[in-house]
Amino acid sequence: MSEHPENMTAPEWAAHIPVLLEEVLEYLAPRKGGRYLDGTLGLAGHASAVLERAGEGTELCGLDRDPEALRRATARLAPFAGQTHLYHLRYSEFEEALDDLGWPTVDGALIDIGVSSMQIDLAERGFSFHADGPLDMRMDPDAHESAWRLVNRERHEVLRDIIARYGEEPMAGRIARAIVDARNTGSIDTTLQLAAIVERAYPAKWRATARNHPATRTFQALRMAVNDELGELERFLDAILARLAPGGRLVVISFHSLEDRIVKHRMRHWAEGCRCPRHVPRCVCGHSPEVRILTKRPVTATDGELARNPRASSAKLRAAEKV
């Protein structure tokens, strides 16, 4: 659990704009005296708003695998020091934190999946091709896997499959081949090196008509592979329902179609009643719905929010309530 340092200054987090903030508060519906889990604390924009909305007596367990994010979040949450319990953990490891606190259940849980604005904006973290930095992409700098190892050590077939699966990149084969050919003349060490290789792998007519930089999907794919982002989500969803109190709410914000698909299918599965085969004339399984889905379709940012925060453009929120 982290301490609350007093040498942190507000500018490190004051400009942070949490995505879909009003929608999170609406669907999480925090109440006084409740216990809440923020599995992806980031710079604590959502967490601080939850605590402000709920008032005294509310407690929040916050997790982040990135120690720098946790350091900054700790400063932002200093006014709520008696109400917060912060851990350097992956969100899939949330049960370790709840068990440490002696919390059998929580009244609400939030995860905001994907890379944070802070991580993108710090070139030395190696997430972005907008500024040069080491080819890293680890959300936890102490983790073993890195983008450098994938790019410089994996076979063509492995790179192709990663870029195709996680990036849904139609040029995955060409890009993987270009990476392997380039590293034959020396290691690929920086983000701009990799971005240039990917850009050259694209046919000129594709580059001329593309809305985004040609490296966008490849960088996304490598980041998701390095941090096992889909595996994290699956493991979290496997465990969270049992740790929600009756009436407890789960709110998930995702930025990628693969993640949103996983969340949608899992919530629909939880909301099913009878699971008997269709040919059985009468229910014999006795299964009843475990959740009530609160969002029939994903909630997205309003035009007003998009004007303030363009990075919210791909955010999708889904929510469910345990019955």
From Swiss-Prot:
Its main location: cytoplasm. One of its GO terms (molecular function) is rRNA (cytosine-N4-)-methyltransferase activity. Pfam families: Methyltransf_5. S-adenosyl-L-methionine binds at residues 44-46, 64, 91, 112, 119. Its EC number is 2.1.1.199. GO terms for cellular component: cytoplasm. InterPro entries: RsmH, SAM-dep_MeTrfase_MraW_recog, SAM-dependent_MTases_sf. The keyword Cytoplasm applies. It is found in: Cytoplasm. One of its GO terms (biological process) is rRNA base methylation. It is an enzyme of class 2 (transferase). The keyword rRNA processing applies. It catalyses: cytidine(1402) in 16S rRNA + S-adenosyl-L-methionine = N(4)-methylcytidine(1402) in 16S rRNA + S-adenosyl-L-homocysteine + H(+). Signal peptide: none annotated. Keywords: Cytoplasm, Methyltransferase, rRNA processing, S-adenosyl-L-methionine, Transferase. It comes from the Bacteria. Specifically methylates the N4 position of cytidine in position 1402 (C1402) of 16S rRNA. Belongs to the methyltransferase superfamily. RsmH family. This is Ribosomal RNA small subunit methyltransferase H.
